[in-house]
Design a protein with these regions (language model features):
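Acidic (Asp/Glu)-rich catalytic clusters
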Residues: 72-74, 102-109, 129-139, 171-175, ...
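N-terminal [4Fe-4S]-dependent radical SAM core
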Residues: 1-82
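Short amphipathic alpha-helices and their capping/turn segments at secondary-structure boundaries
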Residues: 68-72, 123-137, 168, 197-207, ...
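Conserved C-terminal portion of the radical SAM core fold
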Residues: 164-223, 239-264
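Structural recognition of alpha->loop->beta junctions
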Residues: 42, 104-111, 198-212, 282-297
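Auxiliary Fe-S-binding modules of radical SAM enzymes
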Residues: 1-20, 210, 218-308
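Hydrophobic faces of well-ordered beta-strands that scaffold small-molecule active sites
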Residues: 20-24, 81-83, 114-116, 140-144, ...
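Core AdoMet radical
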Residues: 48-68, 72-95, 110-123, 138-166, ...
Length: 308
């Protein structure tokens, strides 16, 4: 039994085979890092701007892409790829620069589309106009991070934008029929389980194309590392997180693609929680919890319509 709709199955439906994302660092930054909004960046984010450790930042986008494709092709015998502009904010630059970057991403013959990670406050109409060109030209997936809909938390973690800006950006992008995803983090400082579920209940009715959920991880060198080591930042327990994810999946529309349910990383970059180094085991526990309940993704989505 399939308990939720996976990103792999979604891409297979579109392209007829397994498609792999190649993470890229375009050398950009974020408006909450460079002082446009605030300085310092998100308090959970490391110096790579949430980019994958496999990214070779010293290389050009073309070389990053070629190196990444060669690595993934060798490991998985893959044939099709998405250029994934992952690190930092990939719509935070003049349109001419962004166009050059996206064009390089699409220039490889085995690249079948783009994934672009960004923020809600970096999607003005000019940027959306540019993205519309690529939406018409290729497979375009726009990932708009929000993490939580609670403004007090967004301020506490130094996001530099509000929940209202997120909802506005989603509305404007959906009018252009973009494929949209967002990211949620469970376990942010000061948030209760009720807060996390309130975020899920606010996001679910948007009927985004896809959703990422993961636990708060403490990365080395981040402001959150200092808080955690000082005992000021409790983290979710493993079983608690499993239960919360199962609760969330039940509320999410069954057609929404689930891109991620557990964050993972290496001990070189993450200090806690310990269980984040066992992604496969946690995924199995989430499925086992849904099996125990006799539920799956979307089982309780109708509740949201009734309460609305």
């Amino acid at each position: 039994m399939s308990y939720y709709r996976t990103f792999n199955s979604y891409l297979r439906e579109i392209f007829g085979e397994r498609v792999y994302r190649v993470p890229l660092d375009a050398g950009l930054t974020c408006p909450n890092r460079d002082g446009t909004k605030v300085f310092g960046g998100c308090t959970f984010c490391d110096e790579r701007g949430s980019g994958a450790p496999t990214i070779k930042t010293a290389l050009s986008i073309k070389n990053q892409l070629e190196t990444g494709i060669a690595r993934i092709r060798h490991r998985f015998k893959a044939h099709k790829f998405l250029a994934y502009f992952q690190a930092f904010t990939n719509t935070y630059a003049p349109e001419g620069i962004l166009k050059e970057l996206y064009d390089v991403g699409l220039d490889h013959p085995d690249v079948v589309g783009l994934c672009i990670g960004t923020r809600p406050d970096c999607l003005d109409e000019n940027i959306l106009d540019l993205l519309s060109v690529y939406h018409e030209r290729t497979f375009l997936f726009l990932e708009v991070g929000v993490q939580t809909i609670h403004n007090r938390t967004l301020e506490a973690i130094n996001r530099g934008h509000t929940a209202e800006e997120f909802f506005d950006a989603v509305e404007r992008a959906q009018k252009r029929n973009f494929r949209l995803a967002t990211h949620l983090i469970f376990g942010l400082p000061g948030e209760s389980e009720a807060d996390m579920m309130e975020t899920v209940r606010a996001i679910a009715p948007l009927k985004l194309e896809a959703l990422k959920i993961h636990q708060l991880c403490i990365y080395k060198g981040t402001p959150m590392e200092a808080d955690y080591l000082a005992g000021r930042l409790p983290l979710l327990e493993e079983d608690q997180y499993v239960r919360l994810v199962a609760d969330a999946l039940e509320l999410i529309p069954e057609e929404t693609v689930i891109m991620r349910l557990v964050a993972e990383g290496s001990r070189d970059e993450i200090i806690a929680p310990e269980w984040c180094f066992e992604k496969d085991r946690i995924m199995q526990k989430i499925e086992a919890e849904l099996e125990r309940r006799g539920t799956k993704q979307g089982s309780r989505y109708a509740e949201l319509a009734v309460k609305a």
